């Protein structure tokens, strides 16, 4: 059989492709528009197509040329929360409407399994910590709303067309392939750890810590972090779960251990050996005190066991990437 990875040139998707190629059990087909992804991030052993998943004619061609594809792993989506607040229609068009087009083509070609990279942003400001799969989903931004709508669309497609699905919900992804060959390269960069490491590199002057009066031990936001290889393993376990005939269901993924912004900063200083200047700033609106996802269900049902369960190990892998490629993939004008 073969697996189609959508968004396989992106940060998490490229690690998924790398993991699949490393296993060597089935052919890997990648589709990416390269709007935010990087061609150099895609393992050379994967079969690559550049195009938009919302282009039905293009996607039909991909499935037609790869009749062994029986499953889709879907990472292709816009994911900037702040941008989604300013450009909500862009997110509903690309993320939500794109899912409709994809499912139409999957149904046409009889592809019955999809593992979907969702987000814990579908929960909004949660009623409980750690967040469980049963926690009410009340997104507070168009990005989270678009992903929740995608989950809903898949639910009804399962009932109507028998397309089985697993949405995986998680928060902060951090780290890179330990040999430093692939990693995180966003433009603009909005994630805490790569920004901290850019300060360590001298690319940025300082890191801004937004808010020091949250209801947490040191007053800064607490978040959980998961490595992209651990996410890749979870996606593959979820796919195997579906292939074994199990029902569609959602799983939360996370370390189940929270780290504050200051703890991440101190750990990065230790790993890099750099001072990493920091400055405190006012809170950003809409930032909850603590966000930690419970991964108990994934561990019990899927047998998921994160290998990168030490935050310093995660940071060290990211630092290896930043040290190897200080300008990232350097493929943007």
From Swiss-Prot:
Protein name: UDP-glucose 4-epimerase
A Pfam cross-reference name: Epimerase
Keywords on record: Carbohydrate metabolism, Galactose metabolism, Isomerase, NAD
Organism: Streptococcus mutans serotype c (strain ATCC 700610 / UA159)
Enzyme category, top tier: isomerase
Pathway: Carbohydrate metabolism; galactose metabolism
Similarity field: Belongs to the NAD(P)-dependent epimerase/dehydratase family.
Single annotated GO MF: UDP-glucose 4-epimerase activity
EC numbers: 5.1.3.2
Signal peptide: none
Function in brief: Involved in the metabolism of galactose. Catalyzes the conversion of UDP-galactose (UDP-Gal) to UDP-glucose (UDP-Glc) through a mechanism involving the transient reduction of NAD.
Active site feature: 143
Subunit structure: Homodimer.
The organism's place on the tree of life at top rank: Bacteria
Catalytic activity: UDP-alpha-D-glucose = UDP-alpha-D-galactose
Positions with a binding annotation for NAD(+): 11-12, 32-37, 52-53, 75-79, 94, 119, 143, 147, 171
Cofactors (names): NAD(+)
Positions annotated to bind substrate: 119, 143, 172, 191-192, 208-210, 223, 284-287
One record GO biological process: galactose catabolic process via UDP-galactose, Leloir pathway
């Amino acid at each position: 059989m073969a697996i189609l990875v959508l968004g396989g040139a992106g940060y998490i998707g490229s690690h998924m492709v790398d993991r699949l190629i490393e296993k060597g059990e089935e052919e890997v087909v990648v589709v990416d528009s390269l709007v935010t992804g990087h061609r150099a991030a895609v393992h050379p052993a994967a079969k690559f197509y550049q195009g938009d998943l919302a282009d039905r004619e293009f996607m039909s061609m991909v499935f037609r040329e790869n009749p062994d594809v029986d499953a889709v792993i879907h990472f292709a989506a816009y994911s900037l929360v702040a941008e989604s607040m300013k450009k909500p229609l862009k997110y509903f068009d690309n993320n939500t409407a794109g899912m409709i087009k994809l499912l139409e083509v999957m149904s046409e070609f009889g592809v019955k399994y999809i593992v979907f990279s969702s987000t814990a942003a579908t929960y909004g400001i949660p009623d409980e910590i750690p967040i469980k799969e049963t926690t009410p989903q009340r997104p507070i931004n168009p990005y989270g709303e678009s992903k929740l709508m995608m989950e809903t669309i898949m639910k009804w497609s399962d009932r109507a067309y028998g397309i089985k699905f697993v949405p995986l919900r998680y928060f902060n992804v951090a780290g890179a392939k330990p040999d430093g060959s692939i990693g995180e390269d966003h433009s603009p960069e909005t994630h805490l750890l790569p920004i901290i490491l850019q300060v360590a590199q001298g690319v940025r002057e300082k890191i801004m810590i937004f808010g020091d009066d949250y209801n947490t031990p040191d007053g800064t936001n607490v978040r959980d972090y998961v490595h992209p290889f651990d996410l890749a393993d979870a996606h593959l376990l979820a796919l195997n779960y579906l292939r074994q005939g199990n029902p569609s269901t959602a799983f939360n993924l996370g370390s189940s251990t929270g780290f504050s912004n200051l703890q991440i900063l101190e750990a990065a200083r230790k790993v890099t050996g750099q001072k990493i200047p920091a400055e405190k700033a006012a809170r950003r609106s809409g930032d909850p005190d603590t966000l930690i996802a419970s991964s108990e269900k994934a561990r019990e049902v899927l047998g998921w066991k994160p290998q990168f369960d030490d935050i310093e190990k995660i940071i060290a892998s990211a630092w290896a990437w930043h040290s190897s490629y200080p300008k990232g993939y350097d493929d943007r004008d």
